[in-house]
Amino acid sequence: IARNWEITRKLRGMAILFQEEMQLDARPAGQVSPRRADGPTEIPPETLNRLHSKLDATYARYGNRTLEMDIYRPKDAWGNLPAIVCIHGGGWRKGSKIHHRKVAQALAARGFVTASIDYRLSGEAPFPAHIQDCKAAVRFLRANAKEYGIDPDNIGAIGHSAAGHLAALLATSARVPELEGEGGNAEFSSAIQAVVPMGGQTDFLSERTRD
């Protein structure tokens, strides 16, 4: 897996905080499930006031279909900041960029440029559309690095559940042309330098998974 140690160290710290905030709900059958990353925990207003936000930035187009991201960065720092693509979970079939908004805001408050992204879900487009969109998001950030004050050589990704799978695949498929897609900025690399995949599905071949 691609790894830049300084970015990964900070991302791991945020992953620990993220997991601590995922409180468990009791279920009648004894099951438990985490709360959404956009659940009841609030980002303090003073933290939000220190962030610059660009919402609904279009990063890819497929005919009349546009994909958007919400970009956050600290107001008191500009230029050559590491960037993080924040990918939402939802079983590849539901969710949106707002479900990772607080993770993106919390990371931005710690000195990153963050991009919480939408991507095509399985009801709209089959695999590999999801990962192609994630790669298009990375290429967009790299292509617009000067505008958003990003270090193009230090881009990472974070995701939980289905997004953990996409983040891991993003980190390990930089040289797989079939997964690049046609989301634009083809002259830029989709490689990332750090990744924190949390609880992602990685075994798609076992009998249990197929069932």
Where are these regions (language model features)?
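Long, internal low-complexity/basic segments
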Residues: 2-38
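N-terminal cap/lid segment of alpha/beta-hydrolase-fold proteins
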Residues: 32-79
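Conserved Rossmann-like nucleotide-binding pocket used by diverse enzymes
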Residues: 53, 113-115, 196
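Short beta-to-alpha linker loops that shape the active-site pocket of alpha/beta-hydrolase fold enzymes
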Residues: 75, 90, 113, 118-122, ...
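Short beta-strand element of the alpha/beta-hydrolase
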Residues: 79-89
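Short N-terminal helix/helix-N-cap motif within the alpha/beta-hydrolase-1
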Residues: 94-101, 124-125, 206
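Short amphipathic alpha-helix adjacent to the substrate-entry channel of hydrolases
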Residues: 96-116
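Primarily recognizes the serine-hydrolase "nucleophile elbow" in alpha/beta-hydrolase
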Residues: 136-210
